[in-house]
Amino acid sequence: MSRTVEQSVSSETYGFDAIRGTQAGNEFYVAMCPLKIIPKLFSFNDHDIPPQLRAQRVLSAARIPAIKNYILNNPNDYIFSSLTASVDGVMKFTPAASLGEEGKLGRLYIAMESRLLINDGQHRRKAIEEALKEKPDMGHEMISVVFFQDSGLKRSQQMFSDLNKNAVKPTKSLNILYDHRDKFSKFVVDLTSEINIFKDRVELEKTTISNRSKKAFTLNGISDATRHLLGITKNRKLTSEEQEITREFWKLVVKYISEWNLLLEGKISSADLRKEFVHGNTNSLNALGIVGRVLIKEYPEDWKEKIKRLRDVDWSRTNPEWEGRLLLNGRMLKNAVGVELAANTILQKCGVELPEDRVKHENKNG
């Protein structure tokens, strides 16, 4: 460029309010960028380039609609973390005049001819572009972008690796607990305080329970089982009737599983319950949910009578009927087919002749 960055601000550079910082001995900048400029700043043309010559993964188109809809459906409370980008070109920070040359607040100028690479956030960037097509007035809202000076392909690849390898996805239970926007999740969380066996006995953060824990169930297990009960695959707001039948179902299950009553009476610990019996495991809860759905569908008038037979079920781990269904060589089995088969076993114990669509699971196993 024939002119300095400052001289060409109006026509040849982007300018942003920014904060300057130092990390690992290198300067970086956090800038506030209008959403409408994000698609212009960052473009993608790496699809045909071999992975070893790229510094980011290929964009997954399947992820974009969900993120776009999240923005559009929550215009008053969506939130995005910062994008992280490398600038291959001229970039200069000018501190605010009142702060002197060492000032941390100022303006960041980036030459328009620079190549900007997103190290973290390319799916958010694409979703923003798609959302703006439907709602362009959101273009004046801001997102923070962390800018680093590009130090070559190897460094950019390392940045991508470092930013992603230590990221830990929240557990399913924690997502349910914290998702106040999702009505189904909120209902399930409320269940944990409404149903006596669940109260103070549900692991709300993890999807597994440690051997010495006082918890007997997991939040994700109750959520999955409730979806099986209602026959829904995606979370949605439940009708008042669905909510009531769910509460009624779980209360009856508690009433007719004798070991759960021992737990309520303090005659057995949660640890011993999990150690000696199968009915606190997520797969067992799912099987119970399926049982409830079948009973309510096939016996709408007297399903409550049928469910009383749960008290006749031998839930102990030593019961050979659970082998290949909830257990494999004595260890809990994590298998969708096993859940269906366990549901069949419980249904038969409840005096139900298996419907044709249930028999097929036995045939597959046979």
Residue ranges: model-predicted function:
Residues 1-366:
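Accessory terminal alpha-helical modules
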